[in-house]
A protein has these predicted regions:
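Mid-to-C-terminal Rossmann-like scaffold of FAD/NAD(P)H-dependent oxidoreductases
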Residues: 305-306, 313, 317-384
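FAD-site-proximal beta/loop scaffold in flavoenzymes
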Residues: 115, 137-147, 250-301
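FAD-binding core/adjacent interface of flavoenzyme oxidoreductases
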Residues: 1-10, 68-157, 233-241, 252, ...
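Exposed aromatic-hydrophobic patches
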Residues: 360, 392-403
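Short, aromatic- and glycine-rich surface loops/edge beta-strands on solvent-exposed regions
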Residues: 372-374, 402-421
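A Rossmann-like FAD-binding core segment of flavoenzymes
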Residues: 69, 74-91, 96-98, 175-262, ...
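Beta1-alpha1 glycine-rich phosphate/pyrophosphate-binding loop at the start
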Residues: 5-69, 73, 145, 154-200
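Predominantly flavin-linked oxidoreductase catalytic cores and closely associated redox partners
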Residues: 105-106, 115-209, 214-223, 290, ...
Length: 421
């Protein structure tokens, strides 16, 4: 079956919904959202805890409530969507191959495409934990789905490896459901989650967090029987004699998220090795003109509100591209300096910036009383004081047109400096 659309959006989660609604509001009528699951909303449907929407709606919502607000807008604007539909591939000339049980094999021609596929969890295999291979080992997201959607309890005595936000939230969720969470072990000397989640999910329930610890052995024949954790040195190697043994039936893994870019790579889109997502410009456009990306497929966000904000930018940019309103120009590269892990966007053109440019970034380690500075030719054009920064919390800085006007090179450098410098 052959089809033609102005805009095709791959992924019907929070990023795809926000992008679709914004593109429609900017004059694009012929839009198709493709979602591989049986319902729209993405991961939010299983995030039944509150804490969503504080930035976007100025009120606290659960995940399904947040998703429903955008779904209602999608329905109101009569934006077409296909569920249970798998995208098989995308070509450089913006032809999408997809398949489902109703329409069969589809070839969809698009004037523009937005990639909003989100991210996936790292598994046990990805981090090579030693030990037996019994039942009772889950990623935190899989456990969340079992409990919140399928209605299955995953275990009674639980150890969690990794202190990402999903792991922290599941520590609380399991406790509320009657399980005993014995410990959360984190390989790094700092938590990978938001401080508010550490307080609300661990401290409030007296769940111990062991920093610089990892799982060194899993023991169990049919089901997990014991998990052994140990302290690690600065080279992340276990220190003999520091082992702690837990009798438990379940191990949850919250060991990082990876942007879902198999399709992006196959299409030939350039990927940033630091984010594992596409390299994007000021319009959230990838290395292939007319193909945009936003949300967790680009870089992992802390809050869904920020995913929505970024995706609205992608939706508006795709509308501009379709209408021929994008101006080409010389790219200015955003390079990372001391302490910065990555920035998004990685490059920009002055011609397409309306008011200001927002840079999202993560730092490599914990910093206190420092400044984020932006330099052009070693000259500081912008600086922001920061009392506390951690890799688990995304930082944002806004560069105004006035600041951008001071750039006199084809690159800027973003770095962390001590306060007195």
């Amino acid at each position: 079956m052959n089809m033609k659309y102005d805009l095709v959006i791959v992924g019907g989660g929070p990023a795809g919904l926000a992008a679709a609604v914004e593109a429609k509001k900017n004059g694009i009528d012929n839009i198709l959202v493709i979602e591989r699951a049986k319902e729209l909303g993405g991961i939010l449907q299983q995030c039944i805890h509150n804490g969503f929407g504080l930035h976007e709606f100025k009120e606290e919502l659960t995940g399904p409530e947040y998703a429903q607000r955008f779904m209602d807008q999608l329905f109101e604007l009569n934006i077409e969507y296909k569920l249970d539909t798998m995208v098989l591939g995308i070509s450089e000339n913006k032809i999408v191959q997809a398949i489902n049980s109703v329409d069969g094999y589809m070839i969809i021609e698009a004037k523009s495409i937005i990639l909003t596929m989100g991210c996936r969890e790292r598994t046990r295999g990805a981090i090579a934990i030693p030990g037996d291979r019994p039942a009772g080992i889950f990623t935190a997201g899989a456990a969340q789905r079992y409990i919140n959607i399928e209605g299955y309890m995953v275990g009674k005595r639980v150890v969690i490896l990794g202190s990402g936000d999903i792991g922290l939230i599941m520590a609380r969720r399991l406790t509320l459901e009657g399980a005993k969470v014995l410990a959360v072990a984190e390989l790094m000397p700092f938590s990978g989650g938001l401080m508010r989640n550490i307080v609300q999910c661990l401290h409030d329930y007296n769940i111990p967090l062991y920093l610089s610890h990892t799982v060194v052995d899993i023991i169990g024949k049919d089901r997990v029987e014991k998990v052994i954790i140990a302290k690690v040195d600065e080279n992340k190697k276990a220190i003999p004699g520091t082992e702690i043994e837990y009798e438990c039936d379940t191990l949850l893994l919250s060991v990082g998220l990876i942007p879902e870019n198999d399709i992006s790579r196959a299409t030939g889109i350039k990927i940033d090795p630091r984010t594992n997502g596409p390299i994007v410009n000021e319009l959230m456009e990838t290395s292939i003109p007319g193909i945009f990306a936003s949300g967790n497929v680009v870089h992992v966000h802390d809050l869904v509100d920020f995913v929505s904000i970024e995706s609205r930018k992608a939706g508006k940019s795709a509308a501009k591209y379709i209408k021929g309103e994008v101006t080409d120009g010389e790219y200015i590269e955003v390079q990372i300096g001391n302490g910065i892990g990555y920035t998004v966007p990685q490059k920009f053109r002055m011609e397409n910036i309306e008011k200001n440019l927002e840079l999202s970034m993560r730092v490599r380690q914990i910093f206190k009383n420092v400044k984020i500075v932006v330099k052009s030719n070693d000259f500081v054009i912008h600086s922001v004081k920061k009392n506390h920064m951690a890799p688990g919390e995304m930082e944002k800085i806004t560069l105004s047109k006035t600041v951008l006007g001071k750039i006199d090179a084809n690159k800027i450098v973003v770095e962390v400096v001590e306060e007195d410098k």
